[in-house]
């Protein structure tokens, strides 16, 4: 999400509605994409998010998938300072498919995404995470939200995730994968453009 908190999820509901409208008009051959959102605790605490998720649930926007970065921390500290909402129950009550995963377990996230892609309604995947994961002193704290980490914290993170590469360097094996995915995307785009013509 970008801009004022809560706006991103509301915008995404609009994008998902537009996709469904275009799909109804042009069919699956031309329009069949999903809308993905990454939203944090603060995003879901805003009032506009309730209106947006209610509408999405009511319209059964099965093409909408929200990944909720559930780290229970805002810039002011713990979310418990200002909010006691059970987001899973809130979304379920609004007609959504809901799942909870360990947000640091990529296999679990991938599995939840695959399930959400075939759901008959919008999906919330609550990814339980630790803000500042791997930082020796800042992990799980308010200062991890937006403060400077410093050399010691950065070194601790790099060690905890076994990242030996220099700063601002993309390792060759990752670059190869990115390029492979880019080429695959280009092939899909070219095939879509042929169908569009």
Residue ranges: model-predicted function:
Residues 1-183:
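Glycine-rich ThDP/TPP pyrophosphate-binding loop and its adjacent helix/strand module
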Residues 180-197:
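Hard-cation-handling environments
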């Amino acid at each position: 999400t970008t801009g004022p908190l809560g706006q991103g999820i509301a915008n995404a509901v609009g994008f998902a509605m537009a996709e469904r409208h275009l799909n109804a008009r042009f069919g699956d051959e031309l329009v069949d994409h999903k809308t993905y959102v990454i939203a944090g605790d603060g995003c879901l605490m805003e009032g506009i998010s309730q209106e947006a998720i209610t509408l999405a649930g009511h319209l059964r926007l099965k093409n909408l998938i929200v990944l909720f970065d559930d780290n229970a921390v805002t810039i002011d500290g713990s979310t418990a300072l200002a909010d006691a909402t059970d987001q899973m129950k809130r979304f379920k009550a609004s007609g959504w498919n809901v799942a909870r995963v360990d947000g640091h377990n990529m296999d679990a996230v991938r599995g939840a995404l695959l399930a959400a892609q075939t759901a008959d309604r919008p999906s919330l995947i609550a990814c339980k995470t630790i803000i500042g994961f791997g930082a020796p002193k800042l992990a799980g704290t308010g200062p991890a939200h937006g403060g400077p980490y410093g050399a010691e914290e950065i070194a601790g993170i790099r060690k905890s995730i076994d990242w030996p590469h220099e700063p601002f360097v993309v390792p060759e094996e990752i670059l190869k994968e990115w390029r492979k995915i880019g080429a695959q995307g280009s092939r899909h785009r070219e095939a879509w453009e042929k169908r569009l013509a």
